[in-house]
Amino acid sequence: MKKIILILIFFSSIIKVRAQQDNPSVDTAWEHIYRGSYPRINDLVHTKLAVSFDYNKSWMFGKEWVTLQPHFYDTDSLTLDAKGMEIKEIAVVKGKSKIPLKYSYDDMQLRITLDKTYKSGEKYTVYLDYISKPDELKLKGSAAITEAKGLYFINPKGETNEHTEIWTQGETESNSAWFPTIDKPDQKTTQEISMTVPSKYVTLSNGLLVHQQKNADGTRTDDWKMDLPNSPYLFFMGVGDYVIVKDKYKKMDVDYYVEKEYAPVAKKIFGETPAMIGFFSKILGVPYVWPKYDQIVGREYVSGAMENTTATLHQDGAYQNARQLVDGNAWENDISHELFHHWFGDLVTTESWSNITLNESFANYSEYLWQQFRHGKDAADELNYSDMQGYLMSESDNKDLVRFYYKNKEDLFDAVSYNKGGRILHMLRNYVGDSAFFKSLKEYLTLYKFKPAEAQQLRLAFEDVTGQDLNWYWNQWYYGSGQPSLDINYDYNNGKARVIVDQVQTTGKIFKLPVAIDVYSQGANKKRYKVWLKNKSDTFYFASLQKPSLINVDAYKVLLEIKNDHKSAEEFEQQYQYAPNYLDRREALEYFAKNKLSALANGLNDKFAGLRLFTLENLEKGKGYTIPSVLNLIEQIAVKDPNKKVQAKAIEILAKLNDSKYRSLFEKYVTDSSYSVAGAALEGLAHLEPEQAYTLAKKYSNDALGKLGEVVSGIISKNASENDFNFLLDHFKNEPLSEDKIKSAIAFAQYLLKVKNTENVKKGVDEIMKLRNQIPEQYRGYIDPVFKQLFSKISDAKKAEGNTDLSNYIDGLLK
């Protein structure tokens, strides 16, 4: 989801408005339906599956032995979730015999009458013979997961050049599309899965591969076993032509399942995993409990990644070649996120989807923890700020973190459960302190391991460790909505500095906030005061012999807030120079970008690459690069900065000047190992020497992704003929979902204006439509204006050419 949210933010920056959707009859009935924990009548104990696949029909043939027991009350019936299956047989197992059972089935649930009344603690095993037909199932997904059919056959007949794969996606309740189960997060079961597949393929599932058997028909049966209980939505199967790249954490297997061409770089993509396992085990005080940890990449995957127990599935955006990795591992946060779920989500699981933030806020916050450990506090704080902005831009002020009222459980996978939840944990860590924070997490994980939990149990763990009543915090942040909007003013009179903080949010709610305030007297000298905001307006006085050079409210920079801070230019200069945190410096640079471009240049020498990049971006927007002293610094960055993205942005700015003195610089860096740097350099050449740039674009087109891919696509599209269609189509198709692909779509659509071949135009607009359809339905109101504009231009051009049928075809795409 995080990837999708960033792309949506990019789209919103293009269109500047949020599309208004016609919705004359709004369904509000759900607002009165309480969604609590699910009644537990029967408990899963063990699930055994034997499956094989029909690749031509995209079917799975399944046999299941599911062992259960009544949760507490005696029962003579069993309800299993089983979506869109053909049921052939249901029986209760008695020794070596099977006794048929009566049942009813509505294509969603099996209601089974058992052979007798079973008492609490009395186990029984039900046998089911069935066929799963996922492609005949129609269910909606969520923002995080765009489909919900559970079992996916990718290129099953080998009709395209794509890899043939099978993979599953269970969350929220989609695994019951390929095996009958009680598909609720509060259920836990051990498991065995036997997969019979063509012998040329490898398989992956939860737990350990305990046996393999070659069969006479050219297939092989792999037996996977998981002895530790986990929830049904975490079950996984993966099948395909993968290379298994071996790694280790201590003596435990840590393997990476990738396509052959990515085997040489698999450890560069996933190789931090063993260190992450060690780091998370240490800070939590709870070792990684599972028997191994594997990661696999799936083509056409419907989410970003999924924490299937011991078998995490990543979308193909995880695939990066050596040149992409020069710019940094774009998938590192996703790797840490899914791994951390093996404590928060897999080991201790949300009791109900209403409490999904217990899984997702922790996984989100793990990204901060890892960034802080591996890349430093500035990098972590930059991520924290980015995630906070992602939440604030989602316009979710009315949503509680724990939501017992919702229309669809899929709607809970949003910027509140993830981003806001992570920020709430960050504030909690700051409030109680590191020692108490991690000790509380250890207690929570220890008390509820292999069990479901809800947010109150997390609170009780924190209260037990800290000795404090934290109901106020949970009520405000977990069971409340919104965030404070602070208006901060300062004055000084008669030896006293005064700070006035007004809470100006329009919800009428007043937040209780512990806040640190630093008062600076001279240079870096400061005194820290800890205060509470708890009124609509709070005023604080600090004795000071002279007017403070800076007063820094929220000195730790941890508050989830919207802020209007009325500092002067001189105070922001002091803040940039002496306040230590990433956000201190960023706030100052933001002020300079709007009010004092000459001071903004200070950010070009910042120790942190992210702020150097931020400075360059704002100098570009404000044309501050035209100041001679600033331009001199940018020229130095273009050749010396150790960070490739910063260097690339500097070259991009030089390209805007159309100055021939930079030609040699562009020619030098157009062959750089970084796609970002090479792309920026090629863009510069395109301004100075269009013919040379076109020749180079054609030359480099077979190895052009990211920024270089965007520039190559733009240059060739601008100059392309009808004969270049297949190249441009393939180039566009092969770009991973990203901001660069969206920019390429605009260039590709421009090219289609001059394509005359009807079938080629259809192929092109269909491919653009595929990109649009990768965005979840509920967010398309943000982006459809962009696609409509692209399609409208192409349609008008074809109508002008007299191709009315093609024009009508294009017009129908977004109706």
Where are these regions (language model features)?
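Structural detector for internal amphipathic alpha-helices that build alpha-solenoid repeat scaffolds
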Residues: K557-E561, L583-K594, N602, R612-Y625, ...
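Sec-dependent N-terminal signal peptides
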Residues: L6-F10
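Non-catalytic accessory/interaction domains
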Residues: V197, K260, F340, Y448-N632, ...
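Eukaryotic acidic, Ser/Thr-rich intrinsically disordered low-complexity regions
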Residues: R780-K815
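Amphipathic alpha-helical scaffolding segments comprising HEAT/armadillo-like alpha-solenoid repeats
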Residues: D565-Q575, K594-N605, G624-V639, D659-T671, ...
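N-terminal signal peptide c-region/cleavage motif recognized by signal peptidases
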Residues: S12-I14
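Hydrophobic alpha-helical and helix-loop surface patches within well-folded domains
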Residues: K3-I5, K16-A19, P24-T28, I87, ...
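Acidic/His-enriched low-complexity segments
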Residues: A19-Y288, A415, N430-V432, Y448
